[in-house]
Amino acid sequence: LPQLRSALAKVERVYALQPLDGAAAPEVRAASRYEGIMPRALLALKNAGRTDLLPLLGEGLARSVYELLRAHRVELQSVPGSSISSVGTSAAPVEVLLIPAPSSAQSVRRRGYAPANLLVQEAARQLNKRLPASVRVRAVDVIGYVPRGRRGSGASLSSRVGAFLLSASETKNEQKSLGAVGRAERMHGALRVMEPALCTGRVSVICDDVVTTGATASEMVRVLQESGSRVLGVCAVAAVPKKAQT
């Protein structure tokens, strides 16, 4: 555990997202690089039932979110009705939605839980103890996979055919063999906001355990923005160094 705590000691700004449409990439923050002890720790949480690691890994995610919110404190002041921008203290605090990357139903059944959801819930618990009263965070699981027969709207024919043939878990497995552009193409149209009304006009932060090429996060940004959410950025426990992204 001391070695893991040391690996999570510094939050870095990561340049990982490369949207295909040329839009500005959202800011990415991670508490560690995905190397050394981090792969073992995160895989232990995901595949070995090591939920006892949640407090420490959740602390890493919480620090990433905290640094992102601090970097955007001026932007948060402009949220209508926020107590940050009000002269008095009667206005409600700004509520930031922490939105976990989705897990496939198959992986949840296999593990018995969704690791990203647990990490986000733990991070939210820790953040609400640390943040000023003018800012609150809430874990909200609103992103899901589009049924495979409806995927790929607006994507290339090959992407639509591939998306149709792959389940959510198969899509994730297939992505491991693709480069950054291939992963982004495969993810386009694969996600949806299950409760758009919950996100409209709200500030959100996308959260995951690991950011690699950013294909999943970029697609989450796209669908959240289409639902009217203001996405501040992407936060993760760890990020794969660029030289390791293939």
Regions found by a protein language model. Name each.
Residues 1-246:
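Glycine-rich phosphate/pyrophosphate-handling loop used in enzymes and phosphotransfer proteins
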